[in-house]
C-alpha cells in the first residue's frame, strides 16, 4: 500500500500541506518514495513539563513541531530518521497514561496519546515502518540510545549525591549519558558522546568514571515516579525543546 501511495497526487498534496504549515523555517519533506502515514497531537514529556506537540509519521522519518495554530501553523521542526528509532511502552502512572518511549542514538523521550487505542495504532505503525526500512536496507536495529531525561520536576535534590538541593542559585543540570538531574559539582566533567554531539557534553561524575575506564554502564529504568506532573490540556506552548537541550 505504501508503494502504491508513494507517487499519488493525494500523498503529494498531504505532504505539501505539512510543508506549508512549517513554512520556510522547516525542511522540505517531499522526496520520491516518501509517504505520509499519519499525524496527530501527542503530549511530549519535556524537561520542564509535558507539552502538546504535532507529530507526523512518514514511512522513513518522524517529524514533530510546536503547535502555533492547530492544523495551520507549526514551528521548531524536528526530523527523526526512523532507521535509528526503537520504541518501548511506558506503564500508566497517575495522569500520565497511554505512553511510550521514542529512543534514538541522538535523543530519547516519552510521548503520551489521548487513548489506549491511539497509542496502539501509533506504536504499530512506527514499528511497521522501522521494520520495513531495516528489511530494505539490510541494516540491523540501532543498539545504543540516548538516555531519556528525567524531568526537572522529579528531582528536588541531586540524583547522584542526594545532598544538594536545587534552588535558583543551585541549578539543575542533566547528565547526557544517564539522563539524571544532577547538581553542578556532580557534573563538572565533559565526555565525547559522538552519537549526540561532535563536542564533549556534560556528564555526571559517575558516568564520567565509567566512560573513562570503558566499564559497562548499568541500564537505567525509565519508570521513575512522575507524581505532580502538570498534564492538563493547556500545555500547548510556543517554546519547545530548547529547554531539553540546555544544561
Curated annotation (Swiss-Prot):
Signal peptide: none annotated. A zinc finger (FYVE-type) spans 152-212. GO terms for biological process: endosome organization; endosome to lysosome transport; protein transport. Keywords: Endoplasmic reticulum, Endosome, Membrane, Metal-binding, Protein transport, Transport, Zinc, Zinc-finger. Its main location: membrane. Zn(2+) 1 binds at residues 158, 161, 183, 186. Residues 35-131 form the PH domain. CDD domains: FYVE_PKHF2, PH_Phafin2-like. Residues 237-247 have a biased composition (Acidic residues). Residues 222-236 have a biased composition (Polar residues). Residues 213-247 are annotated as: Disordered. The keyword Zinc applies. GO terms for molecular function: phosphatidylinositol binding; zinc ion binding. InterPro entries: PH-like_dom_sf, PH_domain, PH_domain-containing_F, PH_Phafin, PLEKHF2_FYVE, Znf_FYVE, Znf_FYVE-rel, Znf_FYVE_PHD. Gene3D superfamilies: Pleckstrin-homology domain (PH domain)/Phosphotyrosine-binding domain (PTB), Zinc/RING finger domain, C3HC4 (zinc finger). The FYVE domain is important for binding to the endosomal membrane. This is Pleckstrin homology domain-containing family F member 2. The gene is plekhf2.
Amino acid at each position: 500500500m505504501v508503494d502504491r501511495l508513494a507517487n499519488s497526487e493525494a500523498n503529494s498534496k498531504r505532504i505539501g500541506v505539512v510543508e506549508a504549515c512549517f513554512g520556510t523555517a522547516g525542511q522540505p519533506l517531499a522526496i520520491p518514495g516518501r509517504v505520509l502515514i499519519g499525524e496527530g497531537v501527542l503530549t511530549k514529556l519535556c524537561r520542564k513539563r509535558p507539552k502538546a506537540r504535532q507529530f507526523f509519521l512518514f514511512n522513513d522519518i518522524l517529524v514533530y513541531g510546536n503547535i502555533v495554530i492547530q492544523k495551520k501553523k507549526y514551528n521548531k521542526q524536528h526530523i527523526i530518521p526512523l532507521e535509528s528509532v526503537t520504541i518501548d511502552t511506558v506503564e500508566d502512572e497517575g495522569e500520565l497514561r497511554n505512553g511510550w518511549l521514542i529512543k534514538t542514538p541522538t535523543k530519547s523521550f516519552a510521548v503520551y496519546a489521548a487513548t489506549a487505542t491511539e497509542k496502539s495504532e501509533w506504536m504499530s505503525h512506527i514499528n511497521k515502518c522501522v521494520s520495513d526500512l531495516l528489511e530494505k536496507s539490510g541494516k540491523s536495529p540501532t543498539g545504543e540510545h540516548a538516555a531519556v531525561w528525567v524531568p526537572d520536576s522529579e528531582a528536588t535534590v541531586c540524583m547522584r549525591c542526594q545532598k544538594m538541593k536545587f534552588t535558583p542559585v543551585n541549578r539543575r543540570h542533566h547528565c547526557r549519558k544517564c539522563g539524571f538531574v544532577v547538581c553542578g559539582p556532580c557534573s563538572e566533567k565533559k565526555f565525547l558522546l559522538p552519537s549526540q554531539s561532535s563536542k564533549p557534553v556534560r556528564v555526571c561524575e559517575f558516568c564520567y568514571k565509567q566512560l573513562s575506564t570503558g566499564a559497562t554502564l548499568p541500564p537505567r529504568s525509565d519508570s521513575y515516579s512522575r507524581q505532580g506532573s502538570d498534564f492538563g490540556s493547556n500545555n500547548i506552548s510556543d517554546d519547545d525543546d530548547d529547554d531539553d537541550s540546555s544544561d
